[in-house]
Regions:
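Extended beta-strand/beta-hairpin segments
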Residues: 1-47, 58-142
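Alpha-helical metal-binding/catalytic segments enriched in His/Glu/Asp
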Residues: 49-53
């Protein structure tokens, strides 16, 4: 089970999303996503991460005079099971993982690229995913 989406965002925050068919995990064929309901929950999560990170990077670049023209994210979601995981104690145990490859386009120095990469970790969605969040669910009274 694995999923892949690619997000591109220009300096005007125009965002495009492409996704691989989640039922064909070995396929690299991507299709344009026109509506969020075309994505699985994992695809929606990755789209949130990439889109949010893109906004953070473009906003930072604009405020600091960095010539960031476009940013794209190639995101892969997968589960790593105990047989592939040295830290998992039980064979039924797995860890969930998102790999995010960030590509930056523009007239950027190495220093600009390093700064933008550091800033990418300040995206609120990235923080929630890496730090965790408590969710308190209950039935509302009628």
């Amino acid at each position: 089970m694995g999923e892949r989406i690619v997000i591109s965002q220009d300096r005007s925050f125009v965002t495009s999303i492409q996704a691989a068919d989640p039922h064909e995990p070995v396929s690299d064929d991507l299709h344009e996503v026109h509506h969020v309901h075309e994505l699985t929950p994992y695809g929606m999560l990755m789209a949130s991460l990439g889109s949010c990170t893109g906004i953070v990077l473009h906003t930072y670049a604009q405020h600091h005079g960095i010539d960031l023209q476009e940013v794209s994210f190639d995101l892969h979601y997968d589960r790593i099971f105990a047989e592939d995981c040295a830290e998992c104690e039980d064979i039924e145990t797995y860890r969930e993982r998102i790999d995010e490859a960030i590509s930056l386009s523009g007239d950027l120095t190495d220093r600009d690229r390093d700064r933008l990469y550091a800033v990418s970790h300040h995206c609120p969605i990235h923080k929630i995913l890496t730090d965790g969040m408590e969710v308190d669910s209950y039935l509302a009274e009628e």
